[in-house]
């Protein structure tokens, strides 16, 4: 006679999820252990114990007989992940440019000095490993460009040490709190997914160690996004609803990424509540949520709005207005890597904004279908932006998980969808498809305009001065402006996806008139430019201009290197 399985036996998918979370803890752990074993033996011992915990957890995940036992194992996996995160932080907490700027902003705040609009070049002079953000006008962004919540949280911790330590403590602590919050709010069988996404894969802890303010915003958004269609159910917010609205306002006061999520969330809440309660009550619910969020945002920003209104306004909007050089993994790579540039870079920004608006409109029109993807849709627009770095996508991925687990499609079954007469007739399916296509056409058209642009400057390297077999001290370049407007060129050399600092033009006109040529003598930002010896390295001479924003590039050969050079008529070996 067959024996019936235990009624309390965990589901197989729960076992697999716990096992995957356990396996994810191996990612990057060996490198941290190797680093610790050479100088911090206590941390190395703790990491070794974490290895033991991982192995034991793997066995128990496959052999636990009761759901409660597996749930306790999920807690053990979370604690192991938190321990590994803290061990890694103890070894690597110097911070990146965001962390360094945040810590300096906190110091200025504690000293009673202005925070916004103040350039701090010495931060980057004394930290050569900290990245600079170059701008299209040939300069760098050396000021603080985020809302003030994270400096306010960092200021009380400045006693911990110099550098960016206080800022990275805040962001790493926020990540741990966010991971625990998401773990606690998810249904029991799904909790290991929170461990895996927040801590296991390693990319979010690395951003936290760099001091990214977006990590604090993420932690504040987690309680907002979990079961978000229930906010205002029955027309009542209650203390929980007001608390979530306050978290939304605080997240917007920590970093700018939540600004893009807010319209989508509010539109989704309005649609769900209108389907339940009607237009007037739904509008009242959204108005109260907005009011609570704005109140918290204003409270956090009030001191800066009063003490430095102009610089505060320009500072918090800086990522949107700084006109940084193009960079990222999105469509802008066409101009960076696959062509010789474009004279229509601004159209990528137009396309990104139009796509964001189109996606918001599509969410409103098709909320019953797109509602579960509300926390993912805003980030799609960044794929077309001039700064389409993958951090804009992955920093908010825990919100994707929260929505996937807690906001099923059934939550939107009765949501209101606007259906004017031309979308509700006998041919409504064709009309809806046509409307969706028309909403996307402007963004696609702008993308096509940007992608088909041509480089406005033609270049030819005529001489390269060297001080050694692989050291270039000066380049001479002949530049021809083929555009109809005068351009102010700014030069740099790249050997990969990043960008080195600007080269100095010691000879040549600052502005090159239309349809003219000039010779420029360029010197590297350091004493020399080291030519990579690695075979296949691609060296590109890039020229950026502002007003209009353009990029002109060419592959070059330099003495002493073994580079792959694109077959291009302007590419000639330096003599």
Predicted regions and their residues:
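Hydrophobic/aromatic-rich transmembrane helices and adjacent perimembrane loops
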Residues: 42-51, 260, 385, 389-423
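Primarily membrane-embedded glycan-assembly and transfer machineries that use lipid-linked glycans
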Residues: 1-77, 84-213, 217-222, 231-234, ...
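Membrane-interface junctions at the ends of membrane-embedded or membrane-associated helices
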Residues: 3-7, 62-65, 228-243, 270-284, ...
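Short aromatic-acidic-glycine turn motif
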Residues: 495-505
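Alpha-helical transmembrane segments of multi-pass membrane proteins
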Residues: 173-176, 214-226, 241-244, 257-260, ...
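Internal/C-terminal transmembrane anchor helices
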Residues: 76-87, 422-451
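Short beta-strand elements
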Residues: 547-575
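Membrane-interface alpha helices of multi-pass inner-membrane proteins
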Residues: 199-206, 221-223, 239-267, 299, ...
């Amino acid at each position: 006679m067959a024996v019936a399985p235990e009624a309390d036996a965990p589901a197989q998918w729960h076992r697999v999820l716990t096992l995957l979370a356990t396996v994810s803890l191996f990612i990057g752990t060996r490198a941290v252990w190797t680093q610790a074993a050479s100088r911090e033996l206590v941390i190395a011992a703790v990491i070794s114990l974490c290895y033991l915990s991982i192995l034991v957890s793997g066995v128990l995940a496959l052999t636990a007989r009761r759901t409660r036992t597996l749930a306790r194992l999920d807690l053990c996996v979370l604690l192991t992940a938190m321990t590994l995160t803290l061990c890694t932080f103890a070894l690597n907490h110097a911070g990146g440019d965001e962390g360094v700027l945040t810590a300096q902003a906190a110091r200025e705040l504690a000293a009673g000095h202005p925070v916004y609009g103040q350039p701090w070049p010495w931060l980057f002079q004394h930290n050569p490993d900290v990245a600079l953000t170059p701008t299209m006008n040939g300069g760098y962004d050396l000021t603080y460009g985020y809302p003030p919540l994270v400096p306010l949280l960092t200021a009380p911790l400045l006693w911990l040490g110099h550098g960016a330590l206080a800022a990275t403590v805040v962001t790493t602590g926020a990540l741990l709190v966010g991971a625990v919050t998401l773990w606690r709010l998810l249904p029991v069988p799904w909790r290991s997914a929170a461990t895996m996404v927040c801590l296991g894969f390693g990319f979010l802890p690395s951003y936290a160690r760099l001091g990214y303010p977006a990590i604090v915003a993420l932690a504040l958004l987690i309680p907002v996004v979990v079961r978000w269609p229930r906010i205002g159910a029955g027309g009542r917010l209650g203390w929980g609803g007001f608390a979530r609205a306050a978290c939304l306002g605080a997240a917007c006061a920590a970093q700018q990424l939540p600004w893009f999520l807010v319209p989508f969330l509010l539109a989704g809440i309005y649609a769900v509540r209108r389907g339940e309660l009607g237009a007037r009550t739904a509008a009242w619910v959204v108005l109260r949520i907005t009011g609570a969020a704005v109140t918290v945002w204003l409270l956090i920003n009030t001191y800066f709005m009063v003490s430095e209104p102009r610089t505060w306004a320009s500072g918090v909007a800086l990522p949107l207005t700084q006109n940084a050089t193009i960079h990222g993994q999105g469509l802008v790579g066409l101009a960076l890597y696959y062509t010789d540039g474009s004279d229509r870079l601004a159209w990528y920004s137009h396309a990104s904004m139009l796509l964001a608006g189109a996606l918001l409109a599509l969410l409103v029109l098709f909320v019953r279908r797109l509602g579960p993807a509300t926390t993912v849709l805003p980030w799609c627009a960044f794929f077309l932006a001039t700064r389409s770095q993958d951090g804009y996508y992955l920093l908010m991925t825990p919100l994707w998980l929260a929505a996937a687990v807690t906001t099923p499609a059934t939550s939107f079954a009765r949501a209101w969808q606007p259906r004017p007469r031309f979308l509700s007739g006998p041919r409504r399916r064709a009309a809806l498809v046509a409307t969706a296509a028309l909403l996307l056409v402007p963004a696609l058209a702008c993308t096509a305009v940007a992608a088909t642009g041509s480089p406005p400057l033609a270049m030819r390297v005529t001489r390269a001065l060297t001080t050694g077999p692989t050291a270039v001290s000066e380049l001479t370049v002949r530049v021809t402006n083929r555009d109809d407007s005068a351009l102010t060129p700014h030069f740099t050399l790249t050997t990969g996806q990043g960008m080195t600092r600007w080269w100095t033009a010691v000879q040549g006109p600052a502005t090159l008139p239309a349809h003219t040529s000039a010779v420029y003598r360029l010197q590297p930002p350091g004493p020399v430019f080291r030519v990579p010896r690695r075979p296949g390295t691609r060296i590109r001479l890039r020229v950026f201009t502002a007003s209009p924003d353009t990029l002109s590039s060419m592959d070059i050969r330099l003495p002493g290197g073994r580079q792959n050079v694109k077959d291009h008529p302007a590419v000639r070996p330096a003599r």
